[in-house]
């Protein structure tokens, strides 16, 4: 899948585009149950996976890519601002999900040979990933493996996407805690830890550096809020996740473009301020979509699978919510959802599927998460990035 297509040509610099195409195609089928859509796209699914297996994987099954071919894609004068080649952790996660989604679609198409090959490739990938990427002493999932096989030690949020590749649940819980403490500010998830020598405290600070140098090296990206909240909710920490969710709701309702979330924010507030300023695109689709995804799929817990004729509802609401009423379109029907006086009433009308309601269970506090809260700015008087000032920094 190209990153850009216009009259001048086609630009391929997105290693995540093709995996996401297959992953979201499967997701659409779960919500719609439209098998005619599957028949239409299945040849493209086969092509996308088989050609990647044949031409773009290494001996361990990892998907290979160039330095600026992940979502951290900025280049200035042809030089990547945050090089992640050639095996970024989130790309391996997306590749794994593409393989498993493809195997599921193959089974639905009665294509047993492809289903078996793709599933086996996914299992092999996950086995190698846990061995090669997980530093359990440092509670770190390496951001990427370099072309020479050495791991990159920069602390970035991409590791939160990789949990499906890792079996050790205790390790994943501890990684979640550390990511929140190092990267998750009250205004969003930073792209790089503030103790890194490449950290840039504000997105735009043209007296000292070009904004592209800060873009993925400290700047907050609101789209990563989704996975940060999701991981907390999965481990029963919805109260912590809710604080970030509420902060984003405040932005959507009272700041910037009303009803939307911005692309970015500064990691550290400006001098004299207590809250970081917004930056980047004032209305960013994936910032908004991730906020909504977490609300529907994890706080409300609505996860349809019309290909198997089921809709799972597993709510994990914060204590602050004592009453709500909503409805969600699923397939040809509507799911009506009410919560009041501690009781849930969920019913599906207009679609032939079984609703499985999994009620929340009281659980003892998890000591791993005790005391975990937002990362707080620890500003320095002088940052290494301030030393990069030159005339080019004034040119946008």
Go through each PLM region and give its residues.
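Aromatic-rich carbohydrate-recognition surfaces in CAZymes
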Residues: 1-65, 72, 88-96, 119, ...
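Extended glycan-interaction surfaces of carbohydrate-active proteins
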Residues: 1-13, 54-87, 127-220, 253-275, ...
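A general alpha-helix detector
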Residues: 24, 101, 158-161, 227
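A short small-residue
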Residues: 27, 78-82, 101-102
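Extended, well-ordered alpha-helical scaffold segments
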Residues: 35-54, 94, 98-130, 168-185, ...
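Surface-exposed helix-capping loop/turn segments at secondary-structure junctions
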Residues: 58-61, 104-114, 133-138, 301
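Non-catalytic C-terminal accessory modules of carbohydrate-active enzymes
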Residues: 181-182, 196, 214, 227-396
